[in-house]
Amino acid sequence: MKKIELLAMLGESKDIIDYLQRKGTVQVEKCDAPESMYYTDTDSSVSQLERLLQTAENARETISFYSPEKKKLTDSFLPRKEVELSDFYEESEKTDVAMAKCREIIDIKKEIADKKADIIREQTAREALIPWERLDIPPNTTGTRHTEVFVGSLPDECTEEALKAGFAAALPDLTALDCEVVSSSNTQSIIVVICLKKDSRRVYDYLRSLNFVRASGGDNENIKAAMERHGKNIEALSSDIDGDEEKIRELSSYREDIDFLIDFLTIRKDKYEAFKKMSLSRNVFYFEGYIPERYCEKTVKGLE
């Protein structure tokens, strides 16, 4: 490796840095700034480019996931395609469009994630209703003009026979009472108890002694209708996701433009990082670095 020092007019800095980047032979190192020269802070520009680069790479990964590129096994061993300088400048004019497509892809990806989360919520809500499936009245039913209806759950397994026997023992004078166990497991039993209005306080007190929890209020919708609603919501969300995934597959036509955008942003980021290591004055710029010896002569001639 040979050490290289370069002092040139500030107005030529862009062309010189572009040339060195294309050649990729010089490693710029930060050095002590000569007297009357200073360093410029490019951190904000680098950070902005890193965010843009992250967006582009995220979009590229999303395209690859939903629309994998068909390649031969040997393609990974081939060198990257070289781009003529004129073509590079022409393609660089399209980077704004490519970035807009990247943002569109990311937005669609977020919508897919949100809808998948909604599906999980709908499935959870539907599964929570399964123990109540045989209930043929809305869970928030409280009664009629003359009767009180208690719909809710007990914390343990319970049979209808045991429930009726418990009422008979605790409230033997009650004759106008009916109860049903809708479902029962070792963790929960769903029950319905119907009694006369005048007996409702005594019935409720007994149920509370069993740790009865009344069904919470809500829409006047029966369980079957609610389960069907959740099922339809899941189908609609799944259909929307299929449509969103197809949109991403259609946007895979911008794959090459996004690949170029990633390279373009990487070059710009590297340029600003290199520029941060260069000393500037009002009219000139200066930097030090290292270059492989075999490239010295050719690089110097190119710079001259």
Report the location of each language-model feature:
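Long, charged N-terminal accessory/stalk domains
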Residues: 1-304
